[in-house]
A protein has these predicted regions:
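A structural "domain/chain start" motif
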Residues: 1-54, 62-63, 129-135, 147-192
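Unusually extended, aromatic-enriched hydrophobic runs near protein termini
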Residues: 49, 73-78, 96-100, 120-123, ...
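Short, Lys/Arg-enriched charge-dense amphipathic segments
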Residues: 79-89, 138-145, 186-190
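Surface-exposed short loop/turn segments
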Residues: 61-113
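A structural detector for beta-sheet-dominated domains
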Residues: 13, 18-20, 74-76, 83, ...
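Short secondary-structure boundary motifs at beta->alpha junctions and helix caps
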Residues: 28, 91-93, 108-158
């Protein structure tokens, strides 16, 4: 209803990051790595939505000053915190993956932000302690867990390690297909 009041068409502007362009790959190491696959996946999901109270354009906008309202999804924070945890008299590594996003509604004509809707989540993983240190990171495992988190797909540690045997692009495509087949983005409390 709100979108009807401010305009008939809402333009999907894609995924972005809340930082300067030079800092993206450093500040959002895993999300930026996944962006090229998540962007078309989300665009396709959005284009298949029915019963919206407004027209949603997921293609390119012809002009930036035509009065169209745009919205984008911006990753604000990507953080992995670690620490040791005693679990049944065994020291393990607890990794906490935190993501915060902002849905930003933007008026192209006046070049003003109409609304920012923040949302965030976190997921925990327990791993074996290796060499009395929890600071050493497996970047592929971290990227996999960030993707699983975005897609609301739950995999055991053993399943995650099996997935790491698959080349990165193939692994991402397999999980996007699984998400699509299971409608995992419709899971309550999904980040997207």
């Amino acid at each position: 209803e709100e979108a009807k009041a401010i305009g008939e068409t809402v333009q999907w502007a894609g995924i972005s990051f809340v930082t300067s362009a030079a800092d993206v790959s450093e500040q959002f190491k895993h999300s930026s790595r996944l962006n090229k696959d998540l962007r078309p996946f989300l665009t396709k999901k959005l284009s298949s939505l029915d019963n919206l109270s407004f027209d949603l354009n997921t293609g390119n906008s012809e002009r930036s000053d035509d009065g169209t309202i745009s919205f984008l999804l911006a990753t604000d924070t990507e953080r992995i915190s670690t620490g040791k945890l005693n679990v049944n008299n065994e020291i393990r590594c607890l990794s906490i993956y935190s993501i915060s996003l902002q849905a930003i509604v933007y008026d192209q004509k006046s070049q003003s932000i109409l609304q920012i809707i923040p949302f965030a989540g976190e997921v925990n993983h327990l791993d074996p302690l290796v060499g009395n240190d929890c600071k050493k990171r497996n970047n592929d495992l971290d990227s996999l867990r960030i993707l699983l988190f975005y897609l609301s797909i739950d995999k055991s540690r053993a399943e995650q390690l099996e997935l790491l045997k698959i080349p990165f692009e193939e692994r991402v495509n397999q999980l996007l297909k699984e998400s699509n087949d299971q409608n995992s983005l419709e899971t309550p409390n999904n980040l997207f």
